[in-house]
């Protein structure tokens, strides 16, 4: 089962995929946000092109576990995606994911401009890997 991971931000959407067996996640691309319609069109194109069977979208939460304004924006976007696609869309806690990737890229001495180009798709990969690891350990289906 091929899965898609999404890291949805105000300016960019990071996209990651798994292999056909749903075992290994890899970064695919970063979508520069233009309009909800174009963003949704591109995501559904990727779903169709790669035969994605489930979308795992990062849901930003506060450190206390509450859904804040950014989380509400993500949920609204995902509602629109669910209308356009028959593929199941689930959310996954993404607390500190982008910060974790940023820290890793800084330690790898990657410049700010290059980090900006990859951070979102790497965050999507981290979200997807977290989901895959939880499935392997039996914490999620």
UniProtKB/Swiss-Prot annotation:
One of its GO terms (cellular component) is cytosol. GO terms for molecular function: nuclease activity. CDD domains: YqgF (cd16964). It is found in: Cytoplasm. Its main location: cytoplasm. Its EC number is 3.1.-.-. Could be a nuclease involved in processing of the 5'-end of pre-16S rRNA. Belongs to the YqgF nuclease family. This is Putative pre-16S rRNA nuclease.
């Amino acid at each position: 089962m091929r899965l898609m991971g999404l890291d949805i931000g105000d300016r960019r959407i990071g996209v990651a995929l798994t292999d056909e067996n749903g075992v290994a996640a890899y970064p695919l691309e970063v979508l520069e946000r233009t309009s909800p319609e174009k963003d949704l069109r591109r995501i559904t194109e990727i779903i169709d092109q790669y035969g994605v069977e489930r979308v795992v979208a990062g849901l930003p939460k506060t450190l206390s576990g509450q859904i804040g304004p950014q989380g509400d924006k993500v949920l609204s976007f995902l509602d629109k995606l669910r209308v356009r696609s028959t593929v199941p869309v689930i959310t996954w806690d993404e607390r500190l994911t982008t910060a974790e990737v940023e820290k890793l890229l800084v330690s790898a001495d990657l410049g700010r401009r290059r980090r900006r180009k990859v951070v979102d798709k790497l965050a999507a990969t981290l979200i997807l890997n977290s989901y895959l690891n939880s499935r392997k350990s039996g914490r999620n289906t």
